[in-house]
């Protein structure tokens, strides 16, 4: 029944009960305090009135006594200074009496009777005060007879009667206020006892309600929290009622179900992470092996590229040297072509000279022939002359012989010249062919020079390209080494992550679920081997 009432409503009702009791107690206390305060004010005012009136009465008596002494001394004819001093004291006493009586008049009055008595007292006081002032005037005027004849005692007795009557009224007021205070005190005792009894009943009821509705359910909730803190999620949480504690049980039940789902999800996630980490470790192992093979291949490639670079550089140097030799050969061939041209020109000149010599030889041959004819004619004429012409015949014979020999020599010279001309022509043709060949050689050498220059340029470009390839291979080698380092770091991270996953699995392993068969995993050997291999 009580667990269907909301705790806030119960606390509100309890608070309302305490407030009602407090209001009742406060109201009654206020009434009692107000009555006590009223009685206390009455007693205080009465005391103030009595004190002020008493002091005023005492001051008037002092003034009367002082004036009597002054009158006695004036009658004894003492120095006037002493009399004046006593009259000054009397005046001071009258001023004090006025001050005290004004305080008496300023106090409030409780009722009409008290006010009437106060008015009568004021009249008698003023009469007595006026009489005392007349005595002072009589003494100042040295009218001792009038001083002695004034009926001051009657006036004083009247004021004394009013004074005593007012004191009796003040005493009656004080006694009445005290009796009222005693009666209020008795009622207060009964009220306090009733309030304490009611408070005790309400307190015991509140304690029973708190124990039933709060303490016991909170102890049950604490037990559930302790079991959850120890990792036991298998204990069922039952919900009763519809108050805040029941809502707390429902929230705790939802929290338990949520924790069960979370722990299950974390366990599944830890297992999935471990499986993924094992696959990552195997992949890292394969990647590390391939990276090492790639690094070795890149090192071999780098060495081959270095050798190829040296070979290409050497080829480039040889090509430059061959190009230089080709340029030298081209220059030499050009010079040979120029010399061949000069030889052709010279051979042409020799051929022309040989032809001229042949013409001269023909002339000599003609002259020899004519000389022979002339020698024949001379021989004929010598024969005709007989003995006289014998010497001339001998001379003619010698001339003929010389002409024959000259003709024969001219023929031989002509044959030689013809042969020489023929050979010169053949040599000229050969020289011309040689010049053409030399020009072909010059063109070929020039082409070879150009080709060798292109080869040298291509070799330089190949050398630069190979250097760039070598740099690229070196960079690839560095990148491969960095990749290998990253593989090591990845393996280390995977191992650390697996350890964290195992730690997480160990952390959630403390939770016990219904139908629980979860076993915390251990570090996989693959990750350990991969980490050890990569670290090594």
UniProtKB/Swiss-Prot annotation:
InterPro entries: 4HB_MCP_dom_sf, Chemotax_Me-accpt_rcpt, Chemotax_Me-accpt_rcpt_Me-site, HAMP_dom, MCP_chemotaxis, MCPsignal_dom, Tar_rcpt_lig-bd. It is found in: Cell inner membrane. Pfam families: HAMP, MCPsignal, TarH. Keywords: Cell inner membrane, Cell membrane, Chemotaxis, Membrane, Methylation, Transducer, Transmembrane, Transmembrane helix. Residues 1-10, 210-536 are cytoplasmic. GO terms for biological process: chemotaxis; signal transduction. It is a multi-pass membrane protein. Disulfide bonds: none annotated. Residues 212-264 form the HAMP domain. The chain crosses the membrane at residues 11-31, 189-209. The keyword Ribosomal protein does not apply. Residues 32-188 are periplasmic. This is Methyl-accepting chemotaxis aspartate transducer. The gene is tas.
């Amino acid at each position: 029944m009580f667990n269907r009432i909301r705790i806030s409503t119960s606390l509100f009702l309890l608070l309302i009960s305490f407030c009602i009791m407090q209001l009742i107690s406060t109201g009654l206390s206020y009434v009692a305090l107000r009555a006590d305060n009223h009685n206390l004010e009455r007693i205080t005012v009465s005391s103030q009135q009595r004190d002020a009136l008493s002091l005023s009465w005492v001051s008037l008596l002092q003034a009367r006594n002082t004036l009597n002494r002054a009158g006695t001394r004036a009658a004894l004819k003492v120095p006037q200074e002493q009399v004046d001093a006593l009259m000054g004291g009397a005046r001071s006493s009258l001023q004090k009496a006025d001050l005290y009586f004004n305080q008496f008049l300023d106090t409030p009055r409780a009722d009409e009777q008290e006010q009437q008595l106060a008015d009568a007292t004021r009249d008698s006081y003023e009469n007595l005060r006026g009489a005392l002032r007349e005595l002072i005037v009589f003494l100042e005027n040295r009218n001792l007879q009038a001083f002695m004849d004034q009926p001051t005692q009657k006036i004083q007795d009247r004021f004394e009667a009013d004074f005593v009557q007012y004191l009796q009224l003040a005493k009656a007021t004080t006694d009445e206020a005290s009796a009222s205070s005693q009666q209020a005190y008795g009622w207060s005792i009964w009220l306090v006892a009733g309030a304490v009894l009611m408070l005790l009943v309400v307190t015991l009821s509140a304690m029973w309600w708190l124990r039933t509705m709060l303490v016991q359910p909170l102890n049950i909730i604490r037990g559930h929290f302790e079991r959850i803190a120890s990792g036991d999620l298998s204990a069922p949480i039952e919900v009763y009622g519809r108050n805040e504690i029941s809502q707390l049980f429902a929230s705790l039940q939802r929290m338990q179900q949520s924790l069960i789902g979370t722990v299950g999800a974390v366990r599944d996630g830890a297992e999935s992470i471990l499986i993924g980490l094992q696959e990552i470790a195997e992949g890292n192992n394969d990647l590390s092996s391939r990276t090492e093979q790639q690094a070795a291949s890149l090192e071999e490639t780098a060495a081959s590229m270095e050798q190829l670079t040296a070979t290409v550089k050497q080829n480039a140097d040889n090509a430059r040297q061959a190009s230089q030799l080709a340029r030298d050969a081209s220059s030499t061939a050009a010079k040979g072509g120029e010399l061949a041209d000069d030889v052709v020109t010279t051979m042409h000149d020799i051929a022309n000279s040989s032809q001229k010599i042949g013409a001269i030889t023909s002339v000599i041959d003609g002259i020899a022939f004519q000389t022979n004819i002339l020698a024949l004619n001379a021989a004929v004429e010598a024969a005709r002359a007989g003995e006289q012409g014998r010497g001339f015949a001998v001379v003619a014979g010698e001339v003929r012989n010389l002409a024959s020999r000259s003709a024969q020599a001219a023929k031989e010279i002509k044959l030689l010249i013809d042969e020489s001309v023929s050979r010169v022509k053949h040599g000229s043709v050969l020289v011309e062919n040689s010049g053409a060949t030399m020009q072909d050689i010059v063109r070929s050498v020039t082409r070879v020079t150009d080709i060798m220059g292109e080869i040298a340029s291509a070799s330089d470009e190949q050398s630069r390209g190979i250097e760039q390839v070598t740099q690229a291979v070196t960079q690839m080698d560095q990148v491969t080494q960095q990749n290998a380092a990253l593989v090591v770091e990845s393996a280390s991270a995977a191992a650390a992550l697996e350890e964290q996953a195992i730690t997480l699995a160990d952390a959630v392993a403390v939770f016990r679920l219904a139908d629980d068969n979860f076993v915390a995993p251990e570090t996989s050997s693959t990750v350990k081997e991969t980490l050890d291999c990569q670290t090594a």
